[in-house]
Amino acid sequence: MRPRVPRLQPLSEAERAEISAAPRTSTAHRALLARLPAMNAVECGGQAGLAHLHRDFTVLAWNLERCLFPLDSAAHVAPKGPQVLLLSEMDHGMARTKQRHTTEDMARALGMAYAFGVEFFEMGLGGATERSFCEDDDNRLGWHGNAILSAVPFEDATMFRLDDHGHWFTPDAGGDAGQPRIGGRNAIAAILPGADGPICFVSTHLESNARADHRATQFDRLMDGVDRFAPDMPVIIGGDLNTGNSAPPGDDWRDEPLFDRAGARGYDWSLTPAGVTTRPSLITPHPARRMKLDWLCARGLTCLRNALLPSLDATGTPLSDHDAVLATLRG
Protein backbone atom coordinates (compact mmCIF):
# COMPACT_ATOMS: atom_id res chain seq x y z
CA MET A 1 0.00 0.00 0.00
CA ARG A 2 1.17 3.53 -0.79
CA PRO A 3 0.45 6.31 1.71
CA ARG A 4 -2.22 8.89 0.95
CA VAL A 5 -1.05 12.46 1.47
CA PRO A 6 -2.62 15.92 1.00
CA ARG A 7 0.49 17.13 -0.85
CA LEU A 8 3.38 15.25 -2.41
CA GLN A 9 6.84 16.17 -1.13
CA PRO A 10 8.90 18.14 -3.70
CA LEU A 11 12.36 16.88 -4.55
CA SER A 12 15.13 18.82 -2.86
CA GLU A 13 18.00 20.39 -4.78
CA ALA A 14 20.26 17.73 -3.27
CA GLU A 15 17.99 14.95 -4.55
CA ARG A 16 17.89 16.49 -8.01
CA ALA A 17 21.68 16.72 -8.05
CA GLU A 18 21.96 13.10 -6.92
CA ILE A 19 19.69 11.98 -9.75
CA SER A 20 21.69 13.93 -12.33
CA ALA A 21 24.96 12.43 -11.09
CA ALA A 22 23.72 8.85 -10.69
CA PRO A 23 24.94 6.12 -13.04
CA ARG A 24 22.32 5.26 -15.64
CA THR A 25 21.76 1.71 -14.41
CA SER A 26 18.70 -0.20 -13.24
CA THR A 27 20.32 -0.73 -9.83
CA ALA A 28 20.84 3.00 -9.34
CA HIS A 29 17.35 3.75 -10.62
CA ARG A 30 15.66 1.32 -8.23
CA ALA A 31 17.54 2.81 -5.28
CA LEU A 32 16.55 6.36 -6.24
CA LEU A 33 12.94 5.43 -6.89
CA ALA A 34 12.57 3.65 -3.56
CA ARG A 35 13.68 6.57 -1.42
CA LEU A 36 11.91 9.50 -3.10
CA PRO A 37 8.69 10.10 -1.12
CA ALA A 38 6.83 11.72 -4.02
CA MET A 39 7.31 8.60 -6.13
CA ASN A 40 5.79 6.36 -3.46
CA ALA A 41 2.60 8.14 -2.37
CA VAL A 42 -0.79 9.19 -3.73
CA GLU A 43 -1.94 12.79 -3.38
CA CYS A 44 -5.64 13.05 -2.54
CA GLY A 45 -7.55 16.33 -2.55
CA GLY A 46 -10.53 18.18 -3.92
CA GLN A 47 -14.13 17.96 -2.80
CA ALA A 48 -16.71 15.36 -3.82
CA GLY A 49 -20.32 16.44 -4.27
CA LEU A 50 -22.17 13.11 -3.96
CA ALA A 51 -22.31 10.49 -1.20
CA HIS A 52 -22.25 7.52 -3.57
CA LEU A 53 -22.34 6.73 -7.27
CA HIS A 54 -25.67 6.48 -9.04
CA ARG A 55 -26.85 2.97 -9.84
CA ASP A 56 -26.18 3.79 -13.49
CA PHE A 57 -23.01 5.86 -13.77
CA THR A 58 -20.67 7.06 -16.51
CA VAL A 59 -16.90 6.63 -16.44
CA LEU A 60 -14.54 8.37 -18.85
CA ALA A 61 -10.90 7.50 -19.63
CA TRP A 62 -8.73 10.11 -21.33
CA ASN A 63 -5.04 10.55 -22.03
CA LEU A 64 -4.75 14.34 -21.88
CA GLU A 65 -1.24 14.57 -23.37
CA ARG A 66 0.28 16.67 -20.54
CA CYS A 67 -3.05 18.55 -20.12
CA LEU A 68 -2.17 21.82 -21.81
CA PHE A 69 -5.71 23.11 -21.22
CA PRO A 70 -7.12 21.84 -17.89
CA LEU A 71 -10.09 24.21 -17.69
CA ASP A 72 -11.05 23.73 -21.33
CA SER A 73 -10.71 19.97 -20.88
CA ALA A 74 -13.00 20.06 -17.83
CA ALA A 75 -15.57 22.07 -19.76
CA HIS A 76 -15.33 19.61 -22.66
CA VAL A 77 -16.26 16.55 -20.57
CA ALA A 78 -18.78 18.19 -18.23
CA PRO A 79 -21.81 17.87 -20.58
CA LYS A 80 -21.30 14.09 -20.67
CA GLY A 81 -21.84 13.92 -16.90
CA PRO A 82 -19.11 11.42 -15.95
CA GLN A 83 -19.02 10.62 -12.25
CA VAL A 84 -15.50 9.18 -12.54
CA LEU A 85 -12.63 10.28 -14.81
CA LEU A 86 -9.58 8.06 -15.36
CA LEU A 87 -6.86 10.41 -16.59
CA SER A 88 -3.31 9.86 -17.82
CA GLU A 89 -0.38 12.09 -18.83
CA MET A 90 -1.27 14.74 -16.25
CA ASP A 91 1.43 17.35 -15.54
CA HIS A 92 2.15 18.86 -12.14
CA GLY A 93 4.75 21.62 -11.90
CA MET A 94 6.00 21.34 -15.49
CA ALA A 95 7.13 24.36 -17.53
CA ARG A 96 5.31 23.16 -20.66
CA THR A 97 1.95 23.42 -18.82
CA LYS A 98 2.78 26.67 -17.00
CA GLN A 99 3.75 24.87 -13.75
CA ARG A 100 0.08 24.07 -13.05
CA HIS A 101 -1.31 21.18 -11.04
CA THR A 102 -3.48 20.11 -13.95
CA THR A 103 -5.31 17.36 -12.01
CA GLU A 104 -6.26 19.71 -9.18
CA ASP A 105 -7.35 22.39 -11.65
CA MET A 106 -9.67 19.99 -13.48
CA ALA A 107 -11.07 18.59 -10.23
CA ARG A 108 -11.83 22.08 -8.93
CA ALA A 109 -13.53 23.07 -12.18
CA LEU A 110 -15.72 19.94 -12.10
CA GLY A 111 -16.42 19.96 -8.35
CA MET A 112 -14.71 16.60 -7.82
CA ALA A 113 -12.24 14.89 -5.53
CA TYR A 114 -8.97 13.63 -7.01
CA ALA A 115 -6.16 11.14 -6.51
CA PHE A 116 -2.85 11.73 -8.32
CA GLY A 117 0.28 9.61 -8.50
CA VAL A 118 3.61 10.37 -10.17
CA GLU A 119 4.72 8.19 -13.06
CA PHE A 120 7.87 10.17 -13.75
CA PHE A 121 10.05 12.89 -12.35
CA GLU A 122 11.08 14.49 -15.64
CA MET A 123 14.67 15.70 -15.68
CA GLY A 124 14.18 17.93 -18.74
CA LEU A 125 11.55 20.10 -20.39
CA GLY A 126 10.27 17.41 -22.76
CA GLY A 127 10.44 16.96 -26.51
CA ALA A 128 10.96 19.67 -29.12
CA THR A 129 7.28 20.53 -29.63
CA GLU A 130 6.71 20.56 -25.86
CA ARG A 131 9.57 22.98 -25.30
CA SER A 132 7.82 25.48 -27.54
CA PHE A 133 5.14 25.81 -24.83
CA CYS A 134 7.67 26.52 -22.06
CA GLU A 135 7.88 30.03 -20.63
CA ASP A 136 10.26 28.99 -17.83
CA ASP A 137 13.71 27.44 -18.11
CA ASP A 138 13.04 24.67 -15.60
CA ASN A 139 10.27 22.63 -14.00
CA ARG A 140 9.10 23.70 -10.55
CA LEU A 141 8.28 20.08 -9.59
CA GLY A 142 8.80 18.02 -12.75
CA TRP A 143 5.99 15.54 -12.14
CA HIS A 144 3.95 13.68 -14.74
CA GLY A 145 1.43 11.01 -13.83
CA ASN A 146 -2.01 9.45 -13.72
CA ALA A 147 -5.11 10.46 -11.83
CA ILE A 148 -8.68 9.64 -10.86
CA LEU A 149 -11.33 12.34 -10.51
CA SER A 150 -14.47 11.36 -8.63
CA ALA A 151 -17.84 12.90 -7.82
CA VAL A 152 -17.92 10.75 -4.66
CA PRO A 153 -15.42 10.50 -1.77
CA PHE A 154 -12.50 8.08 -1.89
CA GLU A 155 -12.86 5.21 0.57
CA ASP A 156 -9.27 4.25 -0.22
CA ALA A 157 -6.63 4.92 -2.87
CA THR A 158 -3.24 3.50 -3.76
CA MET A 159 -0.70 3.21 -6.56
CA PHE A 160 0.73 0.11 -8.25
CA ARG A 161 4.16 0.50 -9.85
CA LEU A 162 4.23 -1.61 -13.00
CA ASP A 163 8.03 -1.47 -13.47
CA ASP A 164 11.04 -0.09 -11.62
CA HIS A 165 14.01 -0.83 -13.88
CA GLY A 166 14.29 2.69 -15.34
CA HIS A 167 12.90 2.26 -18.84
CA TRP A 168 13.39 6.00 -19.47
CA PHE A 169 16.56 6.31 -17.37
CA THR A 170 18.93 3.58 -18.48
CA PRO A 171 20.28 4.04 -22.05
CA ASP A 172 19.65 0.47 -23.18
CA ALA A 173 16.07 0.01 -21.92
CA GLY A 174 14.25 1.53 -24.89
CA GLY A 175 13.01 4.91 -23.68
CA ASP A 176 13.67 8.25 -25.35
CA ALA A 177 17.21 9.39 -24.47
CA GLY A 178 16.12 12.98 -25.09
CA GLN A 179 13.55 12.77 -22.27
CA PRO A 180 15.39 11.30 -19.24
CA ARG A 181 13.09 10.42 -16.34
CA ILE A 182 13.04 8.76 -12.94
CA GLY A 183 10.05 6.48 -12.42
CA GLY A 184 8.02 4.10 -14.49
CA ARG A 185 4.53 3.19 -15.57
CA ASN A 186 1.94 2.97 -12.82
CA ALA A 187 -1.73 2.57 -12.04
CA ILE A 188 -3.79 4.62 -9.60
CA ALA A 189 -6.51 2.55 -7.91
CA ALA A 190 -9.36 3.83 -5.78
CA ILE A 191 -12.29 2.30 -3.94
CA LEU A 192 -15.44 4.39 -4.37
CA PRO A 193 -18.88 3.95 -2.79
CA GLY A 194 -21.38 2.56 -5.29
CA ALA A 195 -25.14 2.36 -4.97
CA ASP A 196 -24.92 -1.26 -3.76
CA GLY A 197 -21.40 -1.38 -2.34
CA PRO A 198 -17.82 -0.41 -3.09
CA ILE A 199 -16.35 -0.44 -6.61
CA CYS A 200 -12.66 -0.34 -7.56
CA PHE A 201 -11.56 2.07 -10.29
CA VAL A 202 -8.11 2.01 -11.89
CA SER A 203 -6.42 4.61 -14.10
CA THR A 204 -3.32 3.42 -15.92
CA HIS A 205 -0.87 4.09 -18.74
CA LEU A 206 1.20 1.22 -20.16
CA GLU A 207 4.58 1.53 -21.84
CA SER A 208 4.75 2.97 -25.35
CA ASN A 209 8.42 2.22 -26.08
CA ALA A 210 8.13 -1.55 -25.69
CA ARG A 211 6.64 -4.60 -27.34
CA ALA A 212 3.35 -6.33 -26.53
CA ASP A 213 4.81 -8.90 -24.12
CA HIS A 214 6.18 -6.07 -21.94
CA ARG A 215 2.72 -4.47 -21.73
CA ALA A 216 1.12 -7.84 -20.99
CA THR A 217 3.44 -8.27 -18.01
CA GLN A 218 2.56 -4.77 -16.81
CA PHE A 219 -1.15 -5.54 -17.07
CA ASP A 220 -0.64 -8.81 -15.16
CA ARG A 221 0.98 -6.81 -12.36
CA LEU A 222 -1.91 -4.37 -12.42
CA MET A 223 -4.51 -7.15 -12.13
CA ASP A 224 -2.52 -8.80 -9.33
CA GLY A 225 -2.46 -5.46 -7.51
CA VAL A 226 -6.22 -5.06 -7.90
CA ASP A 227 -6.83 -8.54 -6.48
CA ARG A 228 -4.80 -7.65 -3.38
CA PHE A 229 -6.24 -4.15 -2.97
CA ALA A 230 -9.91 -4.82 -3.75
CA PRO A 231 -10.60 -8.57 -3.51
CA ASP A 232 -14.06 -9.77 -4.57
CA MET A 233 -15.07 -6.28 -5.68
CA PRO A 234 -16.40 -4.99 -9.02
CA VAL A 235 -13.55 -3.38 -10.98
CA ILE A 236 -13.21 -0.88 -13.83
CA ILE A 237 -9.83 -0.32 -15.50
CA GLY A 238 -9.26 2.45 -18.01
CA GLY A 239 -6.46 4.27 -19.74
CA ASP A 240 -3.94 4.41 -22.55
CA LEU A 241 -2.70 0.84 -22.92
CA ASN A 242 -0.50 1.74 -25.92
CA THR A 243 -1.80 -1.31 -27.76
CA GLY A 244 0.01 -1.79 -31.05
CA ASN A 245 2.77 0.72 -30.25
CA SER A 246 6.30 -0.39 -31.21
CA ALA A 247 4.79 -3.45 -32.87
CA PRO A 248 6.71 -5.35 -35.56
CA PRO A 249 5.54 -4.89 -39.17
CA GLY A 250 2.15 -6.46 -39.77
CA ASP A 251 1.09 -6.47 -36.10
CA ASP A 252 -1.38 -4.10 -34.44
CA TRP A 253 -3.47 -3.84 -31.29
CA ARG A 254 -5.28 -7.10 -32.06
CA ASP A 255 -2.04 -9.01 -31.42
CA GLU A 256 -1.60 -7.81 -27.82
CA PRO A 257 -1.76 -10.77 -25.40
CA LEU A 258 -3.04 -8.62 -22.54
CA PHE A 259 -6.61 -8.85 -23.89
CA ASP A 260 -6.83 -12.64 -23.59
CA ARG A 261 -5.00 -12.65 -20.25
CA ALA A 262 -7.47 -10.17 -18.81
CA GLY A 263 -10.41 -12.03 -20.33
CA ALA A 264 -9.25 -15.23 -18.62
CA ARG A 265 -9.48 -13.38 -15.31
CA GLY A 266 -13.04 -12.22 -15.92
CA TYR A 267 -12.53 -8.80 -17.50
CA ASP A 268 -14.91 -7.65 -20.24
CA TRP A 269 -13.52 -5.40 -23.00
CA SER A 270 -16.90 -4.57 -24.58
CA LEU A 271 -16.98 -1.30 -22.61
CA THR A 272 -14.60 0.18 -25.19
CA PRO A 273 -16.31 1.71 -28.24
CA ALA A 274 -15.20 0.85 -31.76
CA GLY A 275 -12.83 3.13 -33.63
CA VAL A 276 -9.33 4.54 -33.39
CA THR A 277 -8.57 6.88 -30.49
CA THR A 278 -5.67 9.08 -31.65
CA ARG A 279 -5.59 12.29 -33.69
CA PRO A 280 -3.11 15.05 -34.60
CA SER A 281 -2.58 17.57 -31.80
CA LEU A 282 -0.56 20.63 -30.90
CA ILE A 283 2.19 18.46 -29.37
CA THR A 284 1.88 15.49 -31.74
CA PRO A 285 1.07 16.90 -35.21
CA HIS A 286 1.20 13.59 -37.08
CA PRO A 287 -1.86 13.24 -39.36
CA ALA A 288 -0.94 9.70 -40.45
CA ARG A 289 -0.85 8.37 -36.88
CA ARG A 290 -4.20 6.62 -36.33
CA MET A 291 -4.16 4.01 -33.58
CA LYS A 292 -6.44 2.31 -31.07
CA LEU A 293 -4.63 2.86 -27.77
CA ASP A 294 -7.33 3.69 -25.21
CA TRP A 295 -9.51 1.17 -23.43
CA LEU A 296 -12.03 0.45 -20.70
CA CYS A 297 -12.64 -2.98 -19.24
CA ALA A 298 -14.61 -4.19 -16.24
CA ARG A 299 -15.33 -7.19 -14.06
CA GLY A 300 -18.61 -7.65 -12.20
CA LEU A 301 -20.46 -4.76 -13.87
CA THR A 302 -22.87 -4.41 -16.81
CA CYS A 303 -22.12 -2.03 -19.67
CA LEU A 304 -25.25 -0.20 -20.86
CA ARG A 305 -23.67 1.93 -23.61
CA ASN A 306 -20.36 3.40 -24.73
CA ALA A 307 -19.03 6.18 -26.92
CA LEU A 308 -15.96 8.04 -28.15
CA LEU A 309 -15.63 11.72 -27.24
CA PRO A 310 -13.50 13.57 -29.83
CA SER A 311 -10.88 15.76 -28.18
CA LEU A 312 -11.63 18.82 -30.33
CA ASP A 313 -13.02 21.80 -28.44
CA ALA A 314 -15.73 24.14 -29.78
CA THR A 315 -13.15 26.04 -31.84
CA GLY A 316 -11.68 22.88 -33.38
CA THR A 317 -8.52 23.02 -31.25
CA PRO A 318 -7.28 19.56 -30.21
CA LEU A 319 -7.08 19.27 -26.42
CA SER A 320 -5.04 16.07 -26.74
CA ASP A 321 -3.73 13.58 -29.27
CA HIS A 322 -6.18 11.05 -27.78
CA ASP A 323 -9.96 10.98 -27.87
CA ALA A 324 -11.75 9.98 -24.67
CA VAL A 325 -13.58 6.67 -24.22
CA LEU A 326 -16.80 6.62 -22.19
CA ALA A 327 -19.06 3.91 -20.85
CA THR A 328 -22.23 3.96 -18.79
CA LEU A 329 -22.43 1.02 -16.41
CA ARG A 330 -24.88 -0.45 -13.94
CA GLY A 331 -23.36 -1.15 -10.55
PLM features: residue spans?
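Structured beta-strand-rich core segments of catalytic domains in phosphoester-bond hydrolases
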Residues: 3-11, 19-45, 91-195
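Short helix-loop capping/hinge motifs at secondary-structure junctions, enriched
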Residues: 153-158, 199, 302-305
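Short catalytic/ligand-binding loop motif for oxyanion handling, primarily in non-cytosolic enzymes
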Residues: 69-70, 93-96, 123-127, 157, ...
